[in-house]
């Protein structure tokens, strides 16, 4: 069966799949802002509504470290977050990248069928993940819940995930300023970072009652402690709670990523239609934006989820233990973590000391993150319409050629630059993620990068639509 025939199998689903109709004309900037704001508000509301019928949600959480990246809130309608949608995209990226599924980019029908296939896969994954979450006892033993409550929980999870999928489609089809998935994820990350920095709640520690938020704790410690030097040290380096060092590292990483956004390779181009008209085509360092780290997180989350579920069911099976052994790390009261196996080696490094104490894990983890981000970035360009062939076609349609090169050599020249730039940019974003984890930030390195690149991308889109300056950080673009 040919790959085109495989795509044709999804054509019958077109008539009854939920779909957002693309706008007939360009949506005005002000309306895009409204649609983006309303979509974000709906998403935030879904993340605050608890699931009806839960007996308990105090079981181990295999996705604890990745919930921010997946825009997931435990025990709410957004339990699944954007994981099924990203996973579906990752699966079809793999199928296309390995030539198991081929589409003709110039064919509108192929592109539409490809999107339908992705949507069908996402719905199947939504159902599958909802079944797994409910039937593995995350909200109480299924026998205690009963069949009606189990079905109700599955329905709630599916309904909310379908709403998220349609909101993403709404924004991506031109009603909003960009990708809904990126926006939802960045908002969830920013919300968690803000809470860790400014949370007014208090917790009981060995040092007495302390404010959870790092900034509030900083001022509180300076106000109540007589020994100001000791208060400063405690505020900057306290353990098991957010501290000011993490706040400063988060701000530093944010600004550094903004700085790197200005790095690009400028390809000189000229017009074949207007004599003397020249310009540049910029190829950015982050050519595929935050897509590599998003897909890498989706891959990791699925491995973690499957590993922990299998370990709970078959804890003594040697093959299952090879995939991952889960438990609470000795000397901590935190969530369950991978203690050995494959899951342990791809689990994020929590600190520089952990990296030094286990160099084998450090090498494996860094290789995995950099390699997977580079591969995802390089293959993503074939799907997203930014491959050398796609850009060469744009040049031809617009009557542009590379300065000093013949028109027939455009594709060959772009093929030398774009795949390398995409892979290098993906590896760079992976390296920044690992570095952020080692330095210590309010959240994982991947989540900080995801939020920063999304915020910058949305700012650029708003600047383009609204016609104002793109210089987000004064002076940064001048250094390029």
From Swiss-Prot:
The chain crosses the membrane at residues 33-55, 76-95, 120-141, 147-167, 213-224, 241-260, 291-311, 362-381, 417-434, 438-459. It comes from the Eukaryota. Residues 1-32, 96-119, 168-212, 261-290, 382-416, 460-480 are cytoplasmic. The keyword Endoplasmic reticulum applies. It is found in: Endoplasmic reticulum membrane. InterPro entries: SecY/SEC61-alpha, SecY_CS, SecY_dom_sf, Translocon_Sec61/SecY_plug_dom. SUPFAM superfamilies: Preprotein translocase SecY subunit. It is a multi-pass membrane protein. GO terms for cellular component: endoplasmic reticulum; rough endoplasmic reticulum membrane; Sec61 translocon complex; translocon complex. Changing residue 273 to P/G: Severe growth defect. Changing residue 406 to E: Severe growth defect; lowers SRP-dependent and SRP-independent translocation. One of its GO terms (molecular function) is protein-transporting ATPase activity. One of its GO terms (biological process) is misfolded protein transport. PROSITE patterns: SECY_1, SECY_2. Belongs to the SecY/SEC61-alpha family. Part of the Sec61 complex, which is the major component of a channel-forming translocon complex that mediates protein translocation across the endoplasmic reticulum (ER). The functional states of the translocon complex include co- and post-translational ER import, cotranslational membrane protein integration and retrograde transport of misfolded proteins out of the ER. In the cotranslational pathway, ribosomes synthesizing presecretory proteins are targeted to the translocon by the cytosolic signal recognition particle (SRP) and its ER-localized receptor. Component of the heterotrimeric Sec61 complex, which is composed of SEC61, SBH1 and SSS1. Presumably three to four Sec61 heterotrimers assemble into an oligomeric ring with a central aqueous pore. In cotranslational ER import, the pore diameter varies from 9-15 A in a ribosome-free resting state to 40-60 A in a functional state when associated with the ribosome. The Sec61 complex is part of a channel-forming translocon complex whose composition seem to change dependent upon different functional states. This is Protein transport protein SEC61. It comes from Saccharomyces cerevisiae (strain ATCC 204508 / S288c). The lineage of its organism: Eukaryota, Fungi, Dikarya, Ascomycota, Saccharomycotina.
């Amino acid at each position: 069966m040919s790959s085109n025939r495989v795509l044709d199998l999804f054509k019958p689903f077109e008539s009854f799949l939920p779909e957002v109709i693309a706008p007939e004309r360009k949506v005005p900037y002000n309306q895009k802002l409204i649609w983006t704001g309303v979509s974000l508000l709906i998403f935030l509301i879904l993340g605050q509504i608890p699931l009806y019928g839960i007996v308990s949600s105090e079981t181990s959480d295999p996705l604890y470290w990745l919930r921010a990246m997946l825009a997931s809130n435990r025990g709410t309608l957004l339990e699944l977050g954007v994981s099924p949608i990203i996973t579906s995209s990752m699966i079809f990226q793999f199928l296309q990248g390995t030539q198991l599924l081929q589409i003709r980019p110039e064919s509108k029908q192929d592109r539409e069928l490809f999107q339908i296939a992705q949507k069908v896969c996402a719905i199947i994954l939504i159902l599958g993940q909802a079944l797994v979450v409910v039937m593995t006892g995350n909200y109480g033993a299924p026998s205690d819940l009963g069949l009606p409550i189990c079905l109700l929980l599955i329905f709630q999870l599916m309904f909310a995930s379908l709403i998220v999928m349609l909101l993403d489609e709404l924004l991506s089809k031109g009603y909003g300023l960009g990708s809904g998935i990126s926006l939802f994820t960045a908002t969830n990350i920013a919300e968690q970072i803000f809470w860790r920095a400014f949370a007014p709640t208090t917790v009981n520690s060995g040092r007495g009652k302390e404010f959870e938020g790092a900034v509030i704790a900083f001022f509180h410690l300076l106000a109540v402690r007589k020994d100001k030097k000791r208060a400063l040290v405690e505020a900057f380096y306290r353990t098991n709670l957010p501290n000011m060092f993490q706040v400063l590292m988060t701000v530093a990483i944010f600004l550094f990523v903004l700085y790197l956004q200005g790095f690009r390779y400028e390809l000189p181009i000229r017009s074949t239609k207007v004599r003397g008209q020249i310009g540049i085509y910029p190829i950015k360092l982050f050519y595929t934006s935050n897509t590599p780290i998003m897909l890498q997180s989706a891959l990791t989350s699925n491995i973690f989820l499957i590993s922990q579920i299998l370990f709970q069911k078959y804890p003594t099976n040697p093959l299952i233990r090879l995939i991952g052994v889960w438990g609470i790390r000795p000397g901590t009261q935190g969530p369950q973590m991978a203690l050995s196996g494959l899951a342990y080696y791809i689990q994020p490094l929590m600190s520089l000391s952990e990296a030094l104490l286990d160099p084998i894990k450090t090498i494996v983890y860094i290789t995995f993150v950099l390699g997977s981000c580079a591969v995802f970035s390089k293959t993503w360009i074939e799907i997203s319409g930014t491959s050398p062939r796609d850009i060469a076609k744009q040049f031809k349609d617009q009557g542009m050629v590379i300065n000093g090169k013949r028109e027939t050599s455009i594709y060959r020249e772009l093929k030398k630059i774009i795949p390398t730039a995409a892979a290098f940019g993906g590896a760079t974003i992976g390296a920044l993620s690992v570095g952020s984890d080692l330095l210590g930030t309010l959240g994982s390195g991947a989540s900080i990068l995801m939020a920063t690149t999304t915020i910058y991308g949305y700012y650029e889109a708003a600047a383009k639509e609204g016609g104002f300056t793109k210089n987000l950080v004064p002076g940064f673009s001048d250094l390029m």
